[in-house]
Every structure is written in C-alpha cells, then in structure tokens.
Regions:
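Charged helix-capping and loop-helix junction motifs
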Residues: 39, 120-130
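Short glycine-rich anion-binding loops that position phosphate/pyrophosphate groups of nucleotides
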Residues: 75, 112-113
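A short acidic, helix-capping loop that chelates divalent metal ions and anchors anionic groups
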Residues: 113-119, 172-175
Length: 197
C-alpha cells in the first residue's frame, strides 16, 4: 500500500517494487486531489496498471485500466453500475463472512498495532484470530493489514491469511524529505516477500 501522501520519486520506487515482485499495489491517498493520482499513474505507465487498485477517485479504474477498486469499510456500496474487481476493508471479524461474499478479497484491519500511528492499536487478540481461522473466516481471501513486519509475518502465514498488506514497515525505511537512495527499502521488501512465501 502506498504512503498516504505523494512524494518525489514515488513512481520510481513503486516501479522498482513491481520489478522486485509486488503483485498488487493499493493506491491509498485519502483526501487528495485526483489530479495527483492521475499524475502518479501516468508516471507509472501502463505496464503496472493491471496490478494497481485504487482506494478513491474510482473513475481512475476505467481511465487507467486498473486492476480494481477498494472500499475502505465493509458496508459502503460500490459505485452504481460498477462491474469489476472489488476489495474492501473489514474492521471486525464479524464483517468477514458477508464482505468476502461480495468482494474478491478483503483486508482485516488492524491485525497488529500500527508502526506509524501509535493511536491505532490491534482490534484482535491472537486467540480471536486463531478461532476465526478455525471457523474458516480467515482464509485465502483475507489479507492482514496493520503492523505487519518481519517479526510477525510468519504468524500471519500460520493463521491462514491469504496475504499481507505492508505499509509502515516498508515506508518507514525511507525518509521522503531527505533521501534519494531507496535501496534499503527494496532490500527490505525482498526480505518481507521471502518471509511470506
């Protein structure tokens, strides 16, 4: 998932992440002008459009031939007439069953305490997650979001999640105001990818 703010060199970093094996980028820029998302998508180019999902400005899905749209809760209806890949975020285990029925995949959030927002703490105990997995609520259609890092990524895999959404653990390795060398970020992405495989 992208940082919530735009920054210089973002398109280059994202293209490199795709080249390193990123298979689905969630373009998450809450409260931003669509013009900036359009610019980023144009800079990324058509090569990565089919691997990009947009969280707002849903018209971008068709205009840039993106993978799909993501709704940031379990209840909001997709745009009228929308036909295409749809994913959404669930904030409670009780939302998973219905959300999975109406979505290609869902995020469960926050699984662990956020690494960037100290006020965002986990909604779930490990026992609750284990029980949800035993009941089949957590499966290949559910991706873990929130506080994912190298220390807990194996636990996510063992719980039966279909994948992970990485945000803070990756972007905290690059200072958008002072750095131009993003090699450490790419190396860390490779470590995360290997840990989940």
């Amino acid at each position: 998932m992208t940082k919530p703010t735009f920054f210089v060199e973002e398109d280059k970093i994202l293209a490199n992440l795709f080249e390193e094996g990123l298979n689905n980028l969630h373009l998450y820029k809450p409260g931003s002008s669509p013009m900036y998302s359009e610019r980023l998508l144009t800079l990324l180019g058509e090569e990565w459009s089919s691997k990009t999902t947009v969280h707002n400005h849903f018209y971008l899905k068709e205009e840039y031939k993106l993978r799909g749209i993501h709704i940031d809760d379990a209840y909001t209806e997709p745009p009228t007439g929308y036909r295409g890949n749809l994913s959404r975020t669930c904030h409670a285990i009780s939302e998973l069953k219905e959300a999975k029925r109406n979505s290609g995949y869902v995020f469960l959030h926050p699984v662990f305490d956020s690494q960037t927002n100290k006020e965002e703490t986990s909604n779930f105990t490990i026992e609750e997650l284990k029980e949800a997995s035993r009941q089949g609520l957590i499966d290949k259609k559910v991706y873990a979001l929130g506080g994912i890092n190298l220390n807990n990524i194996k636990q996510i895999r063992d719980l039966g999640f279909g994948g992970v959404v990485i945000c803070g653990d990756l972007w905290n390795r690059f200072d958008i105001h002072n750095e131009f060398d993003y090699k450490e970020l790419l190396v860390h992405f490779t470590r995360l990818k290997k840990a989940i495989e």
